[in-house]
Amino acid sequence: MKNSETYFHNFESIDNTKKSILFIAGAGMDHRLVRAIRLSDSEYNKPLIIDLPGHGESKGSSSNSIEYYGQFLIKALEPYELKDLSLCGHSMGGLIALDMVLNHNFEAKELILVNSIYPTRVADALLAKAKVGNGGAANFIIKYGLYRRLLGMRNAFSEADDLVMLDDLDACNNYELDLNDIKNVEIPISIILGSKDRLVDLKAVENFTDIVPSQTYTMDEVGHFSFFEDPVELSRLISKIV
C-alpha cells in the first residue's frame, strides 16, 4: 500500500482481531527484510513494515537521526489505530524501536531487538566506505556480518545514489539514551542474537542486560542477518515471544 510518499507493506490486509508486528529495517534496508518471515495466519497479520524515507519504495530523504525515523513511523501509523502491536527492529531498527517507546511514549505490546543493541557504534572503516557510496558500505557489512553463504544478499540494500547508508550509520553512531530510563519502561524487551554475529558488541549486550530487564535468545550458526540466514528459526522465536 502507498500514499504519495510512503510505502506500507502488508497494511492492506490488516485484521484487527489478530496480533500485529511492525518490523523496522536496519541501515540501508527496506521491506524486503521480511520476505521470508512466516507467522501463523490464524494468529498474526502478515509482517508489517514501513519503508523509511529514502529507503525502498518510500520517497523523501534519509536522515542521520534515529529520533527522526522514530517520529516518522509513529506519524505514519496514526491512521491505522493498531492495537496489540509489537515492535521488532533489526540492527538500526532496534534503536528506532527503543526510541519510539522511550522518547515518544509509543505503546507497544512487546519490543524485540534482532541483531541489535544499544549502544551501536560503527567502525571508522565502515563509515569511510559509506562516504564513498552505498555499495561499498553494503559489501563491508555483508563481508563481516554474514555467516551463512547467501546469494543475492547485496540486493537487500539500497541501490540509490544518495548516501543512505552513511546517514543511517551516522544515526546509529549519534544516538544517545540512558539505559536507566529504558529500565523503567513497562514493556517486555527481548533480544535475539546470532552466535556468529561480529557486528554486535557483546560487551554492550552484557551492559544492557545487566541494567535493563530483558530476555536474550541466541540463534546458532547465524550472523548479523538472521532474517535471511535462518528465517524459519527467527519466525519461531518471534512467535514464541509475541
Language model feature labels by segment:
Residues V185, I191-L193, D197:
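Short beta-strand/loop motif that positions the catalytic acidic residue
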Residues A25-A27, L85, G89-S91, G194:
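Conserved alpha/beta-hydrolase "nucleophile elbow" surrounding the catalytic nucleophile
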Residues L95-A138:
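Flexible "cap/lid" loop of the alpha/beta hydrolase fold
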Residues A125-N184:
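Conserved alpha/beta-hydrolase catalytic His-Asp/Glu region
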Residues R198-A204:
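Conserved alpha/beta-hydrolase "acid-adjacent" motif
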Residues H9-K59:
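Conserved HGGG/HGGXW glycine-rich cap/lid loop of the alpha/beta-hydrolase fold
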Residues V222-S235:
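Catalytic histidine-centered segment of alpha/beta-hydrolase-like enzymes
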